[in-house]
Curated annotation (Swiss-Prot):
The lineage of its organism: Bacteria, Pseudomonadati, Pseudomonadota, Betaproteobacteria, Burkholderiales. One of its GO terms (cellular component) is bacterial-type flagellum. Plays an important role in bacterial chemotaxis signal transduction pathway by accelerating the dephosphorylation of phosphorylated CheY (CheY-P). One of its GO terms (molecular function) is phosphoprotein phosphatase activity. Its EC number is 3.1.3.-. Residues 1-23, 203-227 are annotated as: Disordered. It is found in: Cytoplasm. Keywords: Chemotaxis, Cytoplasm, Flagellar rotation, Hydrolase, Protein phosphatase. This is Protein phosphatase CheZ.
Length: 243
């Protein structure tokens, strides 16, 4: 008959207590490995100067957020000014319209059946009072129309801000693409350069002007083969890298 096996004082138990210790050890190794990889990546980026690209891209994000908040505030204020002007001008216009329609109906009735002199006098007095008040009403309406027009000044200000945000988005894209291009394998870089050159030649032949290629982000100095010249090339680069 087999004797039961008992764990000695120095032996590790066969139960479930050994699994958490092994799992903790594996987790520690994974964390240590991730830390080493992070440090290696950080040191490599610093040596290559790529940390500055990422730093500039990261610094642009809060600025872009603040500018977008400014655009939202300006458009909200302009919308409120327009709505307030409409709320002021609309009753004035409605009052003028109602009084004009009432006077027209009274004059039409008098022409259909002439009335006594006293009633004609009253109708004429009401008409003159309406005509005297009409310039004030139109001036008030014109003032609100001017306010609506002035409220559109946000378009120029926000347009400048939006252009700045677009420039910052371009900067972020440029810096991140620089990091990607400078760290891909040489054969990948040559393959992308050939694709970029083919796209550039195709676009030049289609537009007849190589200047149209300057609209996209450029991630390398002029004259190098790994220059990204339009958004199609950016998409092609990211696709070739598996993104």
């Amino acid at each position: 008959m087999n004797e039961p096996i008992h764990a000695g004082p120095g032996d590790a138990p066969f139960g479930g207590d050994s699994q958490p210790e092994g799992a903790d050890l594996a987790s520690d190794r994974i964390l240590a490995r991730i830390g080493q990889l992070t440090r290696t990546l950080r040191d490599s980026m610093r040596e290559l100067g790529l940390d500055k690209h990422v730093e500039r891209a990261a610094e642009a994000v809060p600025d872009a957020r603040d500018r977008l908040r400014y655009v939202a505030t300006m458009t909200e204020q302009a919308a409120e000014r327009v709505l307030n002007a409409i709320e002021i001008a609309k009753p004035v216009q409605e009052r003028v319209q109602n009084e004009a329609e009432a006077l027209d109906a009274r004059w039409a009735q008098w022409y259909a059946a002439p009335i006594e002199h006293a009633e004609v006098r009253e109708l004429m007095d009401d008409t003159r009072a309406f005509l005297r008040a009409l310039p004030d009403a139109t001036s008030a309406t014109n003032a609100q129309l001017l306010e609506i027009m002035l409220a559109q000044d946000f378009q120029d200000l926000t347009g400048q801000v939006i252009k700045k945000i677009m420039d910052m988005v371009y900067l972020i894209e440029q810096q991140l693409l620089t990091v990607l291009v400078e760290n891909i394998a040489p054969e990948r870089r040559e393959q992308f350069a050939a694709t970029a050159a083919a796209l550039a030649a195709e676009k030049t032949s289609a537009t007849g002007s190589p200047e149209s290629l300057l609209n996209g982000p450029q991630i390398a100095p002029e004259g190098k083969p790994d220059v990204v010249q339009d958004q199609a090339q950016v998409d092609d680069l990211l696709a070739s890298l598996g993104f």
